[in-house]
Amino acid sequence: MPEADSGESGQPFILSDRIFVRQREKMIKIYVADILYIEADRNYCRIFSKTHEYLLCITLKAIEEKLDNRIFLRVHRSYIINLSHIDAVAEDHVIINQKAIPVSEGLKEKLLQRIQTL
């Protein structure tokens, strides 16, 4: 089970290619390229990477404001995805790492504009 962020601010520290999140008494480095998607869970967020899951005490909106919008896109009120990890796009969801992530009707057009289609 992932550990909740116990830091004072709860805010991840973000550099251009990595973020640092507080887990217990230490800061853990997560490469931005390894983040698959981020899921909101009330006032918490779960960051899913290729190998781990991290639970942070921060809202999805606060994370969204800090992430590079060229790489990440909010596709639902509860999800932000890393565009480079999309495996498939269906009518109402995207597949990332065998997980179906819902795409809101209002955000679908933005998603389709951001991905290259032939």
Give names to the regions the model predicted.
Residues P2-I96:
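Conserved binding/recognition cores within well-folded domains
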